């Protein structure tokens, strides 16, 4: 089924989101739509199926097959959505219903559009689960029991269960590790081709786009500025915004021939601030901030028992920049949550600055009154993986960013609350500017008014505002386009250069980012450390087959 958009313009109040956009996707064609965060990609995709805010003004035309979407009523749109058009949304954890089982979720479009008996529905669900690489053992699970990769596969299965003729995929691999990204894209494109369907694939990642589409459009500030075959855009970009995206993608990709940044791009991220090479740790072996010994973590009940960590040893020294890498479900997030006292450990012990903050024996009793624990929580900041889940939807950006300072306000040196407020406002302005957000523009906004990349920038700003001794970032750039990543990497590296004693832990599946941020790396697989060492040595000469698999999947 074809998609034909002509002269589409969309505005909300005085803000113009899309301006005179025209594009087409032919029958059986896979087309990409690429652009930086906030360029209007997701809004264009939503406009293609009538999922736009009620207060928006939209002009132009959008045809799905012979059906006109612009101006169509709700009943007409309901007949098209889910049956003829399937949508894979950006964040599966937000798109899926948390109170529905996987089976109920995938079966819902069938129940809405077809009159089938229950056995037929369940058989189709099982067949679709098998096609997306999932087993029948997850049929009765809820979304919160699934990994990110599993949730995204369930989202794809839900979108494809009715065999629609047009697939709209909005950043379907965001926040997935490189191996899972490759598998999901290959699986999605294979299913689309087998069904003879068309697909519009929205992304900011050229390494993903090269696998998902044959040609693409480039969107910049709500306008289409370029279009060509994907290979042509990668090899010879002509438009400025396309060049920036391609250069940024190459700068942050892995190269088997040359892992140094300076020879790969001319962007602002320079080798003098590339702390993966400059921050060699001169601390003594005993100068550790965190020491974790023989950490075991068991999740779930007796029936669903999962050993998330299996005897992990972990040291973090003063000034060290360390990366934890691994696929979805490898235990990366569980490890950092254990370090920060957010996850009970089943065995082992954790020390912070030489003092025990958690053991298996005291894990179940409150440590809030323990001075060592309180000291650790004051001096450590965490950037969560999902910014929308971490930000209070009722709070403005300014209030969210200032929250850590408000909590520890009594430690700030000032003579009055008025001075305190001025100091806090000044610090909020500083960190928002640091992550590339104008405080005058974004300070009064709410999370629902932010793009995915902008929300992640707010989360990073909030983590930095307290000048932490330890910064722990859990997939800090999973929702940010490649152009923004270079600016954020610059910000991280400038901060590290000015505060050489601050230790950082970067949890990521993005090996291109890790090579510029970390001096050492730990590779986790199924809760076990399979390889560790100097980041350049690991990336250029990996010993373990799993490490090689991660690197191969991340190479552009």
Predicted regions and their residues:
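Conserved ABC ATPase "signature" region
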Residues: 120-137, 422-441, 552
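Conserved ABC transporter NBD signature motif
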Residues: 57-69, 348-362, 376
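Conserved ABC ATPase signature
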Residues: 142-146, 150, 446-450, 454
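Helix-to-loop junction immediately C-terminal to a conserved catalytic motif
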Residues: 49, 340
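ABC ATPase NBD coupling module
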Residues: 69-86, 104, 112, 233-237, ...
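A short, surface-exposed alpha-helical micro-motif characterized by mixed small hydrophobic
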Residues: 209-211, 514-516
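ABC ATPase "signature
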Residues: 224-228, 529-533
């Amino acid at each position: 089924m074809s998609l034909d958009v002509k002269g589409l313009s969309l505005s909300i109040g005085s803000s113009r989101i899309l301006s005179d956009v025209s594009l087409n996707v032919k029958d059986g064609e896979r087309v990409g739509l690429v652009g930086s965060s906030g360029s209007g990609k997701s809004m264009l995709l939503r406009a293609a199926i009538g999922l736009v805010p009620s207060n928006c003004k939209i002009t132009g035309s959008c045809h799905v097959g012979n059906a006109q979407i612009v101006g169509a009523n709700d009943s007409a749109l309901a007949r098209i959505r889910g049956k003829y058009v399937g949508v894979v949304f950006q964040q599966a954890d937000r798109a899926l219903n948390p109170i529905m089982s996987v089976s109920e979720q995938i079966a819902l479009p069938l129940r809405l559009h077809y009159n089938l008996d229950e056995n037929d529905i369940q058989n189709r669900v099982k067949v679709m689960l098998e096609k997306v690489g999932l087993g029948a053992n997850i049929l009765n699970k809820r979304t919160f029991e699934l990994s990110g990769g599993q949730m995204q596969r369930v989202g794809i299965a839900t979108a494809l269960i009715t065999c629609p003729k047009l697939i709209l995929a909005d950043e379907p691999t965001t926040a997935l590790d490189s191996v899972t990204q490759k598998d999901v894209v290959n699986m999605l494109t294979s299913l689309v081709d087998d069904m003879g369907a068309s697909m519009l694939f929205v992304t900011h990642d050229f390494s993903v786009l090269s696998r998902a589409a044959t040609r693409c459009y480039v969107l910049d500030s709500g306008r289409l500025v370029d279009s060509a075959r994907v290979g042509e855009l990668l090899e010879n970009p002509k438009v400025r915004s396309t060049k920036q995206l391609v250069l940024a993608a190459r700068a942050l990709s892995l190269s088997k021939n040359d892992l140094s940044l300076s020879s790969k791009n001319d962007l602002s991220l320079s080798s003098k601030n590339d702390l993966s090479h400059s921050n060699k740790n001169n601390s003594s072996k005993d100068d550790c901030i965190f020491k974790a010994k023989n950490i075991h973590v068991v999740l779930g009940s007796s029936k669903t028992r999962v050993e998330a960590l299996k005897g992990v040893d972990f040291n973090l020294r003063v000034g060290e920049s360390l990366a934890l890498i691994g696929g979805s479900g490898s235990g990366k997030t569980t490890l950092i949550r254990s370090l920060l006292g957010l996850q009970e450990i089943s065995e082992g012990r954790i020390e912070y600055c030489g003092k025990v903050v958690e053991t298996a024996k005291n894990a179940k009793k409150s440590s809030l009154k323990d001075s060592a624990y309180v000291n650790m929580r004051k001096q450590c900041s965490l950037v969560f993986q999902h910014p929308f889940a971490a930000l209070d939807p009722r709070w403005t950006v300014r209030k969210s960013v200032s929250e850590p300072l408000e909590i520890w306000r009594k430690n700030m040196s000032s003579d009055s609350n008025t001075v305190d407020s001025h100091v806090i406002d000044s610090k909020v302005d500083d960190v928002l500017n640091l992550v590339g957000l104008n405080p005058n523009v974004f300070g009064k906004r709410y999370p629902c008014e932010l793009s995915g990349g902008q929300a992640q920038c707010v989360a990073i700003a909030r983590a930095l505002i307290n000048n932490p001794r330890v910064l722990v970032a859990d997939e800090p750039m999973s929702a940010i386009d490649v152009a923004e990543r270079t600016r954020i990497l610059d910000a991280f590296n400038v901060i590290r250069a000015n505060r050489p004693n601050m230790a950082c832990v970067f949890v990521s599946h993005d090996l291109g980012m890790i090579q510029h941020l970390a001096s050492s790396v730990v590779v986790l697989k199924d809760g076990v450390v399979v390889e560790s060492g100097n980041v350049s040595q690991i990336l250029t000469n990996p010993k373990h087959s799993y490490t090689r698999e991660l690197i191969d999947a991340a190479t552009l």
